[in-house]
Amino acid sequence: MTDTPATTDLSRVHFVGIGGSGMSGLARILVSRGAVVTGSDVKKSTAVDVLRTMGAHIAIGHAAENLDLAGDKPTVVVTSFAAIPQDNPELTAAREAGIPVIRRSDLLAELMEGHRQVLLAGTHGKTSTTSMAVSALQQAGLDPSFAIGGQLNRAGTNAHGGTGDAFVAEADESDASLLRYSPYVAVITNIEPDHLDYFGTAESYYQVFDDFADRVVEGGYLVVCLEDAQAATTGERAAQRGIQVLGYGAGSAVDEDSAVPLAAEILEETVSAAGAHIRVRLALPGQAPQELSYDLHVPGHHMVLNSAAALLAGALAGGDPAELAAGLTDFTGVRRRFEYRGSERGIRVFDDYAHHPTEVSAVLNAARAKADAEGEGARVIACFQPHLYSRTMKFDAEFAQALALADAAVVLDIYGAREQPVEGITSRIITDKMPEDMPVIFEPDFSEAAGDVISLAQSGDIVLTIGAGTVTYVAGEILSELGRNNEAEEPKEPNV
């Protein structure tokens, strides 16, 4: 249980789990604003090292005395609802001392007060779309504050306290945290049942997006993807309640009878080995329509949709459309979103955070499009690690279908994260449903994963490590093993 005071004293803030992507970003912003920041985490990380260089006091391991790292006790303690158990010794000590304990989402809401909030929500694509919006707004000279779940490749950070009026952030629906915010622009990329361990039913999950739409401030906008049926329906319901709703998508893929106007229409999507050339017709309320073109260097139609959402959201937030489009051309991606890790022996290795069947399908389709555009017979090899027992049991058949888009696959055992193992449940429930004629390896031994991938791959292939857990480390191990007897090849930005 957490406390949510109307106004929180943010002069001295302690983070329990400060190394997480979401928590470390908010800690960065607080340090930049002059707050005394302390925290703890179970292990060292790059995020911890960076925060220490900025002046934060951080302990490795959780203990009650960590509340005294900076001398005086903190004025507030911040925790992540999903990752930190409520009997954590620091949380217990804080409550005994009468120190307010709040969630990360409560802190983000406090930090966004007084800003024009641009919130990106949806089952998939939040991090990529948020990152694109930030890149576009930066190019437009607006210097937005931002908090992202991943690290921008070009900026090298996941958060920033800007001088501009806009604050761009992800709106996480997994525990209804998105209902803490008051967006001027609220984007819904798509809606597909997920996090049912929290919501219980698909209907309850859908409802949280309806409630999010109702959080849009007076004069603000809800932006929805009209290619996604549930997002479009949510937009239509919101419009009936008097909310200003605008849509985006390719005209040929949108219901022409939709009550939501198509404000960012994708007119052209020309795919090449270098990425895609995009042409969009932007029709903002009260303005003459204009056509804009940009080149997108991250593959996949899902990324094209994300870029259209970012363009529309950025324009509604006050950015010049032509400058926003230039910012999308400059966008080089986000860590762990089809991230290029390197190449050895002609085998290119990419890493992606996808952990839902729809996301796995999207990233494998993007890899397939890249391979086909090169026209050199490249194959796609997937190394997948399921995330959560509950999600694996619910979507085993869908994961099998998604992985079948690859030419071959290595499937690691389940990364349980916050969940306890379920007796009799392994990743075999996925591999047993995959095509019999497809080369598939079920690998319960994590240390063997890199070798398994290498046994399947050949020069010219694209290898993808996929998942929200420790599979990201396999990408580096693959490159190390491939290059062990060769001179290491310097990783360089590929033509994606």
UniProtKB/Swiss-Prot annotation:
Pathway listed: Cell wall biogenesis; peptidoglycan biosynthesis
Reactions it catalyzes: UDP-N-acetyl-alpha-D-muramate + L-alanine + ATP = UDP-N-acetyl-alpha-D-muramoyl-L-alanine + ADP + phosphate + H(+)
Assigned keywords, A-Z: ATP-binding, Cell cycle, Cell division, Cell shape, Cell wall biogenesis/degradation, Cytoplasm, Ligase, Nucleotide-binding, Peptidoglycan synthesis
GO terms under biological process: cell division; cell wall organization; peptidoglycan biosynthetic process; regulation of cell shape
Gene3D superfamilies xrefs: Mur ligase, C-terminal domain (3.90.190.20), Mur-like, catalytic domain (3.40.1190.10), NAD(P)-binding Rossmann-like Domain (3.40.50.720)
Pfam families attached to this UniProt entry: Mur_ligase, Mur_ligase_C, Mur_ligase_M
A GO cellular component annotation in the UniProt record: cytoplasm
Subcellular location: Cytoplasm
Cited NCBIfam families: murC
Descriptive protein name: UDP-N-acetylmuramate--L-alanine ligase
Native source species: Corynebacterium aurimucosum (strain ATCC 700975 / DSM 44827 / CIP 107346 / CN-1)
Lineage, opening ranks: Bacteria, Bacillati, Actinomycetota, Actinomycetes, Mycobacteriales
